[in-house]
Amino acid sequence: MTLNPQRVRASSTTAHGWLDVGRCEDFLVHEARLLDEARFDEWLALFTEDARYWVPSEPGQASPHDTVSLMYDDRRLLETRVRRLASPRIYSQEPRSRTSRIVTNVSLADAGPDGGSVVRSKFVLIECRREQQRLFAGTYFHRLAVRDGAIRIAMKRVDLVNCDAPMDGLVIPF
């Protein structure tokens, strides 16, 4: 399951049955807060069991299978990533990063065949660690689904504005 931005058509503020822009915005702000507060186990719980998390390495990349990606995780790899972030021995996070995310321009796109909705938003992420500050910006595409009465992430695609630029290690989830 992948999300191709060229196939996502915005539907502005219309609702897709169970979901409207306000509810999507609340969910995305909640996700950003969990990440900024390093509550990674709670963040992981937002994903479905068959979820994918994808950060393409090329602008407009249509598939994670055709070329290398900055990140392409299934649920199992996400669990490993979260375990590493929780470890006191993760050298790349000594001291731990402090982050601040801004999520904006939230819009609903066409509902998927599974009844889930694709939500598009813009983001800015600032990561501070030691004396360094890094800035990331781009577009999120979330395919959301309802599981056991709660909104869950079935797919998250992160299109970085500078995805094809050289980068130091990417440890913190976007």
Task: Report the location of each language-model feature.
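Short, low-complexity N-terminal intrinsically disordered segments enriched in polar/charged residues
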Residues: 2-49
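A solvent-exposed, acidic/Ser-Thr-rich amphipathic alpha-helical stretch
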Residues: 49-119
